[in-house]
């Protein structure tokens, strides 16, 4: 057998290990079922928090959020109180594409989150969903004009999904077909060393249609299966297309489950006296009153309004800070949903979760000024609860058009022709395995 020295990666955003097993047992995915007998198929874990931008940044860098610098879809500037969407230019670690490029490998990447703005690679980089104009989202730049002319679409319009589910489903199908068309087009152009395509449409499908599938509700239960039949056809075509010298890696970045309630943590902080606003409703983070003790960013990231760190901080580092963190954690764990179930499974100290060493080896001596993007507390919800971070909502619990939400567990990993250590159990540990495949760079 020919030695495999090239790698094809297909990422299905948010596709659960358990879902693939169910669909295979139902006969929906015969190509994938055949494929798993030829390789290794197992559960994969995400990172905390299990968000696409955070998890794929970890995949690309082999680092935890505290190391690569992305801890959510939204970050804060503690000096100005501005909130902003972090992009690839804020990564603190060199991404896999650049490492491979510097070693002379030819690389291709399409639609992977946290690759916008595009950066120079030895090959082609097509940015993902933070990019609004494909003509400005590629390296080299002329690729963007080519994609635009071919009708390539970066992402489906989520606002359409809030108004018209049928129209949104049709959009998902259209975007998928354009993505796959371009994937096969570019793959045929040359012999790539590393070729990766990311499909965001599976994540979008789950957010809007999970209820219909899990409860077998017409008409979208069958459409959900229809979508995965098409995914299976794509997997089958990829398998047949790959030459003998190319290994195959399929994966997702997090799992999914039925969404019970959206939970608005800043509302909870207001109701419990920890968060005050200059005006109601608040229009921006700058409306957070200096007397506030804490605020939250999505999902479940809680920041103490700390003196010397936040612009208008009023909580002293030391005993006052430690006491407040402990009080918030204890109260959050008592929060119950309208159905009587506990919302919060765990509340972690940020430095513990991300491995930041405490001074003198004790949490009592942790310097919160060193945390950077790391939240003081990270609330981990029980499955089915989505901890929102908007400044204000008219109720603590809500149910909307979204019917699926992320999980830390139940992502999936399939690999054939590449060795992956059994110890590589989370998405951030795969980078090292890929680099080993390419000679231990």
Residue ranges and their predicted role:
Residues 380-430:
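Low-complexity, glycine/alanine/valine/leucine- and proline-rich hydrophobic stretches
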């Amino acid at each position: 057998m020919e030695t495999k020295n090239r790698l094809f990666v297909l990422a299905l955003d948010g596709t659960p290990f358990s879902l693939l097993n169910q669909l295979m047992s139902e006969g929906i995915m015969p190509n994938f079922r055949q494929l798993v007998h030829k390789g290794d198929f197992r559960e994969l874990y995400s990172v905390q928090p299990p968000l696409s931008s955070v998890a794929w940044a970890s995949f690309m860098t082999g680092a935890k959020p505290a190391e690569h610098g992305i801890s959510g879809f939204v970050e804060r500037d503690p000096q100005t109180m501005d909130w902003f969407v972090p992009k690839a230019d804020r990564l603190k670690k060199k991404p896999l594409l650049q490492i491979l490029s510097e070693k002379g490998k030819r690389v291709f990447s399409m639609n992977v989150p946290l690759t916008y703005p595009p950066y120079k690679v030895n090959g082609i980089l097509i940015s993902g969903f933070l990019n609004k104009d494909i003509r400005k989202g590629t390296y080299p730049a002329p690729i963007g004009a080519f994609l635009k002319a071919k009708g390539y679409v970066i992402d489906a319009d989520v606002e359409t999904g809030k108004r018209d589910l049928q129209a949104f489903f049709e959009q998902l199908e259209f975007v998928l077909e354009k993505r796959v068309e371009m994937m096969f087009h570019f793959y045929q152009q040359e012999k790539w060393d590393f070729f990766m395509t990311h499909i965001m449409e599976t994540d979008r499908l789950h957010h809007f249609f999970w209820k219909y599938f899990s409860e077998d509700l017409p008409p979208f239960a069958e459409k959900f299966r229809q979508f995965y039949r098409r995914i299976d056809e794509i997997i089958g075509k990829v398998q047949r297309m790959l030459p003998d010298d190319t290994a195959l890696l399929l994966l997702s970045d997090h799992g999914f489950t039925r969404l019970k309630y959206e939970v608005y943590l800043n509302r909870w902080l207001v109701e419990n006296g920890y968060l005050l606003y200059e005006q109601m409703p608040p229009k921006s983070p700058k409306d957070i009153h200096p007397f506030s003790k804490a605020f939250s960013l999505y999902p479940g990231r809680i920041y103490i309004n700390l003196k010397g760190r936040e612009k208008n901080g009023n909580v002293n580092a030391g005993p006052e800070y430690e006491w407040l963190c402990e009080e918030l954690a204890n109260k959050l764990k008592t929060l119950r949903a309208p159905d009587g179930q506990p919302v919060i499974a765990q509340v972690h100290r940020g430095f513990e979760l991300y491995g930041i060493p405490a001074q003198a080896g004790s949490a009592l001596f942790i310097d919160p000024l060193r945390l950077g993007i790391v939240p003081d507390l990270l609330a981990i919800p029980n499955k089915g609860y989505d901890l929102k971070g908007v400044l204000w909502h008219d109720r603590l619990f809500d149910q909307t058009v979204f019917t699926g939400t992320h999980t830390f567990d139940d992502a999936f990993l399939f690999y054939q022709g590449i060795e992956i250590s059994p110890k590589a159990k989370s998405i951030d540990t795969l980078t090292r395995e890929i680099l080993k495949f390419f000679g231990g760079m």
